[in-house]
Amino acid sequence: MNKWTFPTQIYAGPDSLNRLTEFNNESILIICDPFLKDSPSLTYVIGLMDSKNKVTIYTDVVPDPPITHVVKGIEFMEGIKPTVIIAIGGGSCIDMSKGIAYFGRKLKHMDIKSFIAVPTTSGTGSEVTSF
């Protein structure tokens, strides 16, 4: 018998983004696809958090990102030392963000308390795995 456990909490529904208002006094890094940078959707998400937190945006995301993009993301992250990472985008964005968070914790000993994925496409499943 095989057993698989993925300790992922999933929030879905029209008000699920409101959970972001629960963050207080955090350094939040939002990693998103470049086309979202000036979108009303991203403005809305930032508005849920920016009055109580320091929010920084990183958009150097490419499809099927090579490890060099993960390294660049870690280098960017070192300057802001986020306590929360939010990935907004498709599978490539979410996977790259998970790599940045993982190596930031393991190699740079950053205190990243929360990783949140907000998928903008369906089908990848990247938001439900920790790897």
Task: Label each region the model flagged.
Residues 68-131:
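Glycine/threonine-rich beta-strand-loop-alpha-helix active-site module
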Residues 1-84:
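ATP/NTP phosphate-donor binding region
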